[in-house]
Protein backbone atom coordinates (compact mmCIF):
# COMPACT_ATOMS: atom_id res chain seq x y z
CA UNK A 1 0.00 0.00 0.00
CA UNK A 2 0.84 3.67 0.23
CA UNK A 3 2.63 3.23 3.55
CA UNK A 4 4.81 0.46 2.15
CA UNK A 5 5.79 2.65 -0.78
CA UNK A 6 6.83 5.32 1.72
CA UNK A 7 9.08 2.83 3.52
CA UNK A 8 6.82 2.37 6.53
CA UNK A 9 6.26 -1.04 8.02
CA UNK A 10 2.81 -1.97 9.27
CA UNK A 11 2.64 -4.86 11.73
CA UNK A 12 -0.80 -6.23 12.53
CA UNK A 13 -1.54 -7.89 15.87
CA UNK A 14 -4.81 -9.76 16.44
CA UNK A 15 -5.74 -10.14 12.76
CA UNK A 16 -8.02 -13.01 13.76
CA UNK A 17 -10.42 -10.35 15.14
CA UNK A 18 -10.88 -8.76 11.69
CA UNK A 19 -14.17 -10.57 11.15
CA UNK A 20 -17.43 -8.89 10.26
CA UNK A 21 -19.97 -7.72 10.18
CA UNK A 22 -18.80 -5.44 12.99
CA UNK A 23 -18.00 -1.85 13.83
CA UNK A 24 -14.23 -1.39 13.73
CA UNK A 25 -13.19 1.51 15.96
CA UNK A 26 -9.65 2.84 15.65
CA UNK A 27 -7.89 5.71 17.39
CA UNK A 28 -7.16 8.77 15.24
CA UNK A 29 -3.58 10.03 15.28
CA UNK A 30 -2.85 10.42 11.56
CA UNK A 31 -4.54 11.48 8.33
CA UNK A 32 -3.86 7.95 7.12
CA UNK A 33 -5.86 6.21 9.87
CA UNK A 34 -9.13 5.86 7.95
CA UNK A 35 -7.44 4.17 4.99
CA UNK A 36 -5.28 2.01 7.24
CA UNK A 37 -8.38 0.90 9.17
CA UNK A 38 -10.35 0.04 6.03
CA UNK A 39 -7.35 -1.80 4.57
CA UNK A 40 -7.17 -4.06 7.65
CA UNK A 41 -10.87 -4.85 7.93
CA UNK A 42 -12.81 -7.48 5.98
CA UNK A 43 -14.17 -6.92 2.52
CA UNK A 44 -17.60 -5.34 2.79
CA UNK A 45 -16.52 -2.58 5.17
CA UNK A 46 -17.48 1.04 4.68
CA UNK A 47 -15.76 3.92 6.39
CA UNK A 48 -17.42 6.97 7.88
CA UNK A 49 -15.73 10.36 7.65
CA UNK A 50 -16.53 14.02 8.15
CA UNK A 51 -18.01 15.63 5.05
CA UNK A 52 -14.98 17.93 4.74
CA UNK A 53 -12.85 14.98 3.63
CA UNK A 54 -14.08 15.51 0.06
CA UNK A 55 -12.00 18.72 -0.07
CA UNK A 56 -8.73 16.90 0.65
CA UNK A 57 -6.68 16.24 -2.49
CA UNK A 58 -6.40 12.50 -3.20
CA UNK A 59 -8.11 11.43 0.05
CA UNK A 60 -11.44 13.03 -0.82
CA UNK A 61 -11.53 11.67 -4.34
CA UNK A 62 -10.55 8.18 -3.17
CA UNK A 63 -13.20 8.33 -0.44
CA UNK A 64 -15.95 9.33 -2.86
CA UNK A 65 -14.90 6.88 -5.57
CA UNK A 66 -15.01 4.05 -3.04
CA UNK A 67 -18.58 5.04 -2.13
CA UNK A 68 -17.90 5.66 1.57
CA UNK A 69 -20.43 7.85 3.42
CA UNK A 70 -19.73 11.19 5.07
CA UNK A 71 -21.36 12.92 8.02
CA UNK A 72 -22.03 16.64 8.56
CA UNK A 73 -20.60 17.19 12.05
CA UNK A 74 -21.66 20.84 12.01
CA UNK A 75 -25.37 20.00 11.85
CA UNK A 76 -26.44 17.59 14.60
CA UNK A 77 -29.85 16.90 13.02
CA UNK A 78 -28.29 15.96 9.67
CA UNK A 79 -25.58 13.98 11.44
CA UNK A 80 -28.14 11.91 13.38
CA UNK A 81 -30.20 11.31 10.22
CA UNK A 82 -27.16 10.18 8.22
CA UNK A 83 -26.05 7.89 11.07
CA UNK A 84 -29.52 6.30 11.25
CA UNK A 85 -29.53 5.80 7.47
CA UNK A 86 -26.04 4.29 7.62
CA UNK A 87 -27.14 1.94 10.42
CA UNK A 88 -30.16 0.77 8.44
CA UNK A 89 -28.09 0.25 5.29
CA UNK A 90 -25.29 -1.62 7.07
CA UNK A 91 -27.74 -3.87 8.92
CA UNK A 92 -29.80 -4.59 5.77
CA UNK A 93 -26.75 -5.37 3.60
CA UNK A 94 -24.54 -7.20 6.13
CA UNK A 95 -21.67 -4.72 5.89
CA UNK A 96 -19.18 -3.60 8.52
CA UNK A 97 -18.32 -0.01 9.39
CA UNK A 98 -15.00 1.48 10.37
CA UNK A 99 -15.03 4.60 12.49
CA UNK A 100 -12.55 6.86 14.22
CA UNK A 101 -14.78 7.65 17.22
CA UNK A 102 -12.62 10.48 18.55
CA UNK A 103 -14.00 12.45 15.60
CA UNK A 104 -10.79 14.42 15.14
CA UNK A 105 -7.11 13.67 14.93
CA UNK A 106 -5.04 13.65 18.11
CA UNK A 107 -1.94 15.77 17.54
CA UNK A 108 -0.10 14.05 20.42
CA UNK A 109 -1.23 10.45 19.99
CA UNK A 110 -3.11 10.57 23.30
CA UNK A 111 -6.65 9.25 23.09
CA UNK A 112 -9.35 11.93 22.87
CA UNK A 113 -12.93 11.60 24.17
CA UNK A 114 -15.19 9.55 21.90
CA UNK A 115 -18.21 11.00 20.12
CA UNK A 116 -21.58 9.34 20.81
CA UNK A 117 -22.24 8.18 17.24
CA UNK A 118 -20.42 4.88 17.63
CA UNK A 119 -22.62 3.88 20.58
CA UNK A 120 -25.82 4.84 18.77
CA UNK A 121 -24.73 2.91 15.67
CA UNK A 122 -23.80 -0.17 17.71
CA UNK A 123 -27.12 -0.20 19.56
CA UNK A 124 -29.10 0.41 16.34
CA UNK A 125 -27.39 -2.36 14.39
CA UNK A 126 -26.57 -4.80 17.19
CA UNK A 127 -23.09 -5.18 15.68
CA UNK A 128 -20.15 -5.90 17.96
CA UNK A 129 -17.44 -3.26 18.29
CA UNK A 130 -13.91 -4.39 17.44
CA UNK A 131 -11.52 -1.96 19.15
CA UNK A 132 -8.39 -1.14 17.18
CA UNK A 133 -5.29 0.64 18.45
CA UNK A 134 -2.77 2.14 16.05
CA UNK A 135 0.62 2.95 17.53
CA UNK A 136 3.38 4.82 15.71
CA UNK A 137 1.37 6.72 13.10
CA UNK A 138 1.57 10.13 14.80
CA UNK A 139 3.37 12.51 12.45
CA UNK A 140 3.33 10.08 9.52
CA UNK A 141 1.95 12.87 7.37
CA UNK A 142 2.35 16.48 8.42
CA UNK A 143 -0.52 18.92 8.00
CA UNK A 144 -0.42 20.54 4.56
CA UNK A 145 2.13 18.06 3.20
CA UNK A 146 1.68 15.17 0.81
CA UNK A 147 4.90 13.53 1.97
CA UNK A 148 4.46 10.42 4.09
CA UNK A 149 7.10 10.01 6.79
CA UNK A 150 8.66 6.58 7.30
CA UNK A 151 7.30 4.92 10.44
CA UNK A 152 7.06 1.54 12.13
CA UNK A 153 3.32 1.28 12.70
CA UNK A 154 1.66 -1.36 14.85
CA UNK A 155 -2.08 -1.96 14.63
CA UNK A 156 -3.72 -4.03 17.35
CA UNK A 157 -7.18 -5.51 16.74
CA UNK A 158 -8.73 -6.44 20.07
CA UNK A 159 -11.48 -9.01 20.71
CA UNK A 160 -14.98 -7.89 19.69
CA UNK A 161 -17.25 -6.36 22.31
CA UNK A 162 -20.91 -7.34 21.99
CA UNK A 163 -23.48 -4.58 22.09
CA UNK A 164 -27.17 -4.81 22.95
CA UNK A 165 -29.60 -4.09 20.15
CA UNK A 166 -31.93 -1.13 20.77
Label for each model-derived stretch:
Residues 3-5, 20-76:
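Catalytic core of membrane glycerolipid acyltransferases/transacylases, capturing the structured
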Residues 4-12, 80-81, 137-140:
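Short gly/ser/thr-rich secondary-structure transition/capping motifs
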Residues 12, 24, 47-48, 155-157:
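Generic preference for hydrophobic
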Residues 17, 58-61, 95-98, 107-166:
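A cross-family acyltransferase "interaction/gating" segment
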Residues 28-30, 102-106:
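Short glycine-rich anion-binding loops that position phosphate/pyrophosphate groups of nucleotides
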Residues 50, 102, 134-135:
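Cofactor-binding loop segments of dinucleotide-utilizing enzymes, especially the Rossmann-like FAD-
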Residues 78-87:
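Anionic-ligand binding region
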Residues 85, 91-93, 110:
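Non-transmembrane, membrane-proximal soluble domains of secreted or membrane proteins
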Amino acid sequence: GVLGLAGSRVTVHGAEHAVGPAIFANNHSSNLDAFLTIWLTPRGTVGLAKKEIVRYPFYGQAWLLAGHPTVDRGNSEKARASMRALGDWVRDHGFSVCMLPEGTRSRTGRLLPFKKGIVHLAVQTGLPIVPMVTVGAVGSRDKGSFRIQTRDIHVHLLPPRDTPRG
